[in-house]
UniProtKB/Swiss-Prot annotation:
Belongs to the major facilitator superfamily. Sugar transporter (TC 2.A.1.1) family. CDD domains: MFS_XylE_like (cd17359). The chain crosses the membrane at residues 18-38, 59-78, 85-105, 115-135, 150-170, 187-207, 266-286, 308-328, 332-352, 367-387, 413-433, 437-457. PANTHER family: PROTON MYO-INOSITOL COTRANSPORTER. Residues 1-17, 79-84, 136-149, 208-265, 329-331, 388-412, 458-468 are cytoplasmic. Its main location: membrane. This is Glucose transport protein. It is found in: Cell membrane. It comes from the Bacteria. It is a multi-pass membrane protein. It comes from Synechocystis sp. (strain ATCC 27184 / PCC 6803 / Kazusa). GO terms for molecular function: carbohydrate:proton symporter activity. Keywords: Cell membrane, Membrane, Sugar transport, Transmembrane, Transmembrane helix, Transport.
């Protein structure tokens, strides 16, 4: 490769790249908002439809499977119709889901709207990191790729905050009627309309991915965008991209197969990163955190407030990753995070393993409660500066131009399936073996992740996408 053809820090249009990456990351914001907004409405939904916990739980878990479906489908759509049209499709799904989730007649049509929104979430989880990686200069790609996770955790935080505010103003999520005669829980879902419409409108205003345009034989359009994004020796950059895309056929899932017929090793690594990101149990902390905080002695109201605070900590730690990912690299941050999660989850396993059970709930007293409170937030910190944002950075950049969208869709689909497995197995684990052994399983996954990163993941800091 000709070093002079690589974009330099002086020629890159940082403000423009940050702007268009921020628009793409709005999909991540909606991803976080949509998955978290239901938490504040669960009790009201159960009361409104008179459903049992199993059926209510399906409204959460089936949305995760919808996300897996959306992720698997987004890659082919993005390769056939482009990154921008895929964003617009996701925005439409978010908009329809937001409206429909607030106007259900039965629990079953509510589940339909949640699954539809889940498909949008899955599509956004693929297209945002792919687009950001494809428009970012190499020296900025880690920081810009981390915007995806920052947007996700910000979406979660804003959803929790808006749920809390609406419930506070209405006197409870089940308060009916409230604003304009609609129950408070309906407004929790309708709030998503604002970012969904903003995402859809802004997607019309940003340029298509230059890598996609080159693959479609539109080199002149790609060159104009690359000049605005990177500057430097654009003709050489176009030649490099042309050498790494499939010009003889449209991208397809069969490109992920090796000559022996199995998946390419890099695809397995992407799937491993996605699965381990979920198997360390981060969503247990956010989905079921009230169990943890009540066991320490907090009331339900204070438990919800602490969950909001934990979400804010997650935002701050993601900013740490943005600051250091292009300085120290991806691999060191992942290793530090894995070690931190292994230690903190191990401590939580020991602490809750010795907890007394009162009315079916683990209860901690004295120093044990304080240790659990501090350790849980240290665990969130360890995840927040490493596996939260860095996995999205790697998934966006580790695959070559020929297979990026397809491979990312497979990896993201695996991530949503792993999320579904963890979210649905935690309640029975809690009922059968308790919190201690459950955290022990997640600690084991964190320990495995250390060896996985050490032996299988290569550093990508500073490399162009054409060097992958």
């Amino acid at each position: 490769m000709n070093p002079s053809s690589s974009p330099s820090q002086s020629t890159a249009n940082v403000k423009f790249v940050l702007l268009i990456s921020g628009v793409a990351a709005l999909g991540g914001f909606l991803f976080g908002f949509d998955t978290a907004v239901i938490n504040g409405a669960v009790a009201a939904l159960q009361k409104h439809f008179q459903t049992d916990s199993l059926l209510t739980g399906l409204s959460v878990s089936l949305a995760l499977l919808g996300s897996a479906l959306g992720a698997f489908g987004a890659g082919p759509i993005a390769d056939r119709h482009g990154r921008i049209k895929t964003m617009i499709l996701a925005a439409v799904l978010f908009t329809l889901s937001s409206i429909g989730s607030g106007l259900p007649f039965t629990i079953w049509d509510f589940i339909f709207w949640r699954v539809l929104g889940g498909i949008g979430v899955g599509a956004a989880s693929v297209i945002a990191p792919a687009y950001i990686a494809e428009v970012s200069p190499a020296h900025l790609r880690g920081r810009l790729g981390s915007l995806q996770q920052l947007a996700i955790v910000s979406g979660i935080f804003i959803a929790l905050l808006s749920n809390w505010f609406i419930a506070l103003m209405a006197g409870g999520s089940a308060q009916n009627p409230w604003l304009f005669g609609a129950a408070a829980w309906r407004w929790m879902f309708w709030t998503e309309l604002i970012p969904a419409l903003l995402y859809g409108v802004c997607a019309f205003l940003i340029p298509e991915s230059p890598r996609y345009l080159v693959a479609q034989g539109q080199g002149e359009k790609a060159a104009a965008i690359l000049w605005k994004v990177e500057g430097g020796d654009v003709p050489s950059r176009i030649e490099e991209i042309q050498a790494t895309v499939s010009l003889d056929h449209k991208p397809r899932f069969s490109d992920l197969l090796s000559r022996r017929g199995g998946l390419l090793p890099i695809v397995w690594i992407g799937m491993g990163l996605s699965a381990l990101q979920q198997f360390v149990g981060i969503n247990v902390i956010f989905y079921y955190s009230s169990v943890l905080w009540r066991s320490v002695g907090f009331t339900e109201e204070k438990s919800l407030l602490i969950t909001v605070i934990t979400g804010f900590i997650n935002i701050l730690t993601t900013l740490v990753a943005i600051a250091f990912v292009d300085k120290f690299g991806r691999k060191p941050l992942l290793l530090m995070g894995s070690i931190g999660m292994t230690i903190t989850l191990g401590i939580l396993s020991v602490v809750f393993g010795g907890a007394t059970v009162v009315n079916g709930q683990p209860t901690l007293t004295g120093a044990a409660g304080i240790i659990a409170l501090v350790t849980a937030n240290l665990y969130v910190f360890s995840f927040g500066f490493s596996w939260g944002p860095i996995v999205w950075v790697l998934l966006g950049e580790m695959f070559n131009n020929k297979i990026r969208a397809a491979a990312l869709s497979v990896a993201a689909g695996v991530q949503w399936i792993a999320n579904f497995i963890i979210s649905t197995t935690f309640p029975p684990l809690l009922d059968t073996v308790g919190l201690g052994p459950a955290y022990g399983l997640y600690a084991t996954s964190a320990a495995i992740s250390i060896f996985f990163i050490w032996f299988f993941v290569k550093e990508t800091k500073g490399k162009t996408l054409e060097q992958m």
